[in-house]
């Protein structure tokens, strides 16, 4: 059963009446451009056909009752009182979004009953949290008929995750969940929020392979990467690493390396990765899948060697995928790192070959069974 059907059904069972409306917000996969978003850089994700559905109805008071179907828990809070953190981590994503919507729209106090469910695997790097934030943001916007655009809802979602949940994420995940387009990857300039849609090449599929090694980014590694990038930006005297050209980096690389080895390595990844994203857009437009494959491989190597966010299981998955796909297409880790998924752009005729090579080798080598998802690029958040 699809999340939107499950949300509607469980809403009726839980509350004893039918939901008025349902919102669906997709997860995302990032084709290339990793950890560049919070450096004001470039990313190239697409929204995917896995996501979060929220069925909801207005109440005649200011209370939100939120039923999380997948874990059978409920949260309740009152929009006419200051919104405080909950002991349930999932509930803080909901409360945080509503809190920052109220900062923008102080008159918003419309109560509601909600039931929500997701088929985005948790801790996979496919943005289960952004799908939750954007679905809640859109729900609130509909409930209150609020004058909020999709990009604003995305930035409110990011604010909630940064300030209320305590994960220092960039804005890519939320922007993609809000602004995704069917059959397109979207290059996002994370500073101007300008979007450049580019069609997914004809005859290619997007495969996402979950290593099933879990990660949780609220803890230290992610935040330390941000601090190292900020150190490097200060070293170059710029607002963000986006403002450093490859030539400027090369000119002062030895000096930065002598001062702070880690900041040097992190900056090397970010600056080269921004360049790879810009080249990837051109490769896609030219239908040059050999070039795109090389850029994806370069991105993975840089994440492994300079940003140091991959793990042996992920490196092995990428290696297997690259063997299966060959030169036309590519594979790399996607998401924050330390587990999660790899993304592949694979010729349709090689999908089963890819699936088989990984099934025959990954578990044998690691003792963990992978999960294989074929995805399509989808529209962003919408009412169903």
Swiss-Prot record:
The active site is at 173 (proton acceptor). It comes from the Bacteria. One of its GO terms (biological process) is galactose metabolic process. It is an enzyme of class 2 (transferase). ATP binds at residues 123-129. Keywords: ATP-binding, Carbohydrate metabolism, Cytoplasm, Galactose metabolism, Kinase, Magnesium, Metal-binding, Nucleotide-binding, Transferase. Mg(2+) binds at residues 129, 161. GO terms for cellular component: cytosol. The keyword ATP-binding applies. This is Galactokinase. Gene3D superfamilies: 3.30.230.10, GHMP kinase, C-terminal domain. Belongs to the GHMP kinase family. GalK subfamily. HAMAP family: Galactokinase (MF_00246). Its EC number is 2.7.1.6. Substrate binds at residues 34-37, 222. Pathway: Carbohydrate metabolism; galactose metabolism. NCBIfam families: gal_kin, PRK05101.1. Catalyzes the transfer of the gamma-phosphate of ATP to D-galactose to form alpha-D-galactose-1-phosphate (Gal-1-P). Its main location: cytoplasm. It is found in: Cytoplasm.
């Amino acid at each position: 059963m699809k999340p939107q059907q499950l949300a509607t059904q469980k809403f009726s069972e839980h509350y004893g009446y039918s939901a008025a409306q349902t919102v669906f917000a997709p997860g995302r996969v990032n084709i290339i451009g990793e950890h560049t978003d919070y450096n004001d850089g470039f990313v190239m994700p697409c929204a995917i056909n896995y996501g979060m559905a929220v069925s909801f109805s207005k109440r005649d008071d200011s209370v939100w009752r939120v039923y999380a179907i997948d874990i059978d828990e409920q949260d309740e809070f009152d929009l006419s009182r200051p919104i405080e953190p909950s002991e349930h981590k999932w509930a803080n994503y909901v409360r945080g979004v509503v809190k920052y919507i109220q900062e923008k729209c102080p008159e918003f106090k419309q109560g509601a009953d909600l039931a929500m469910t997701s088929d985005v695997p948790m801790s996979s790097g496919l943005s289960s949290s952004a799908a939750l934030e954007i679905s809640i943001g859109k729900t609130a916007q509909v409930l209150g008929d609020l004058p909020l655009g999709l990009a604003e809802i995305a930035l409110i979602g990011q604010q909630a995750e940064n300030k209320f949940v305590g994960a220092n994420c960039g804005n890519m995940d939320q922007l993609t969940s809000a602004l995704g387009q069917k059959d397109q990857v979207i290059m996002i300039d994370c500073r101007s929020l300008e979007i450049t849609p580019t069609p997914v090449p004809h005859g290619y599929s997007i495969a996402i392979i979950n290593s099933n090694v879990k990660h949780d980014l609220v803890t230290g590694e992610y935040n330390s990467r941000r601090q190292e990038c900020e150190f490097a930006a200060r070293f170059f005297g710029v607002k963000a690493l986006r403002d450093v050209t490859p030539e400027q980096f090369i000119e002062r690389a030895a000096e930065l390396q002598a001062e702070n080895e880690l900041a040097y390595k992190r900056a090397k990844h970010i600056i080269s990765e921004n360049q790879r994203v810009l080249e990837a857009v051109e490769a896609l437009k030219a239908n040059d899948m050999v070039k795109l494959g090389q850029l994806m491989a370069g991105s993975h190597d840089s994440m492994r060697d300079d940003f140091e966010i991959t793990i042996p299981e992920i490196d092995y998955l990428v290696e297997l995928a690259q063997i299966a796909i060959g030169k036309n297409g590519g594979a790399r880790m996607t998401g924050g790192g330390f587990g999660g998924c790899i993304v592949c752009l694979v010729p349709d005729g090689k999908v089963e070959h890819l699936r088989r090579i990984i099934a025959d080798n990954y578990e044998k080598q690691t003792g963990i069974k992978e999960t294989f998802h074929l995805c399509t690029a989808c529209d962003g958040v919408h009412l169903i």
